[in-house]
Amino acid sequence: MKHSVTVVQDEKENFGTVVKGFVIKLMPAMPKWNGKNLVRKVLIPLASIVLFIGLWHVGAKALYNIEADYKIQKALTDQGQEAADQMAECIASGAISCQPNTLPSPAQVWTSFNTLIADHKAISADKAEFKAKTATLNVKREAEGKAPITYTGRPSFVDQIFTSLKTVFAGFLLALIIAVPVGVIIGLSTTLRSSFNWLIQIFKPVSPVVWLLLVFMIVKTMTKNSDSDSAFIISFISVGLCSMWATLVNTAMGVATVDKDYINVAKVLKLGPIQKVFKVILPSSLPLIFTGLRITLSVAWMVLIAIELLAQSPGLGSFVWEEFQNGAIDSNSKIIVAMFVIGIIGFLLDRIMLTVQSMVSFNKNATA
């Protein structure tokens, strides 16, 4: 009995050690906060943020004044002094109808951000109310074999963010499934590398718009009598085809440049072809493969906006285009909010990939 208790305690200690090691890998070590680190890691970044916001505010104010002067001068030229005076008074009063529509200030962008969050909360409340009202009816419809009644209201800004994330992850997964196996096969053979190099070099620089049109033609034909979401399918396939090339090239290069000593060790151990790939070649190629995957994810996120805009998928691309078309006084500030959200999410996705790379790869210098 005492022996079994000791074994359980040992297992708990081993599990705790594994979890602790995982957390240490996932979270970077905290720096020692001496004066030099405090200045370099905190004060200088904060100063750069303050400087950026200050320059932005000054630039927005200057553009506002230029646009306001233009509107006043135009009123003077077209309608006379009285109209110009009225325009000047209207602009000074802050009335929405006559405000210059130019680069928004940081304060306006922050206000629009809060407006979008409040709008999301209101839409979420409407969804919850709709779900509660239709719950009984949907249970009855499902029992009768009918499709449930779903909420068809407009998506909120936060909903569109999650739609874009779903699309980019589906596209990234497609790129991974295609690029890594094909890259391994091409990398194992000099003949295949020479045979497929021209194909890669031709398709790698193709514009996302062209890929979208090609995918659109194929998907529309194949989903004519289907209830599937063709906009989502078109978007994620286009994203995957646009972004897979960096992973394909890096995987082939990583496989082709595996140290010959590792290959010789595999021969000595008499590993079969499959064992050699999974136990020697792929582990040795991981640094280059993950570099390609990081580039693929970044490219996927960049091309997503243009693809969603054209495919009419209800994501961030659609949000930006609708606000641009809307032309309301706060449309520009909402577009700037979307720009910051896109940039921050792109940065976080890259950090996640870098963290995963450091956990599964022996290359500890990949910290760019």
Where does each model-flagged region fall?
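Transmembrane alpha-helices
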Residues: 273-307, 337
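N-terminal signal-anchor/first transmembrane alpha helix
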Residues: 30-69
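Periplasmic/extracellular loop-to-transmembrane helix junction in inner-membrane transport proteins
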Residues: 30, 65-172
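Alpha-helical membrane-interface segments at transmembrane helix boundaries
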Residues: 158-170, 193, 200-203, 286, ...
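Short cytoplasmic-facing helical segments at TM-TM junctions of multi-pass membrane proteins
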Residues: 246, 250-289
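Generic hydrophobic transmembrane alpha-helix motif, especially the helices
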Residues: 187, 197, 201-244, 254
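Transmembrane-helix boundary motif in ABC transporter permease subunits
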Residues: 170-200
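C-terminal transmembrane helix and the adjacent membrane-cytosol boundary/short C-terminal tail
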Residues: 336-368
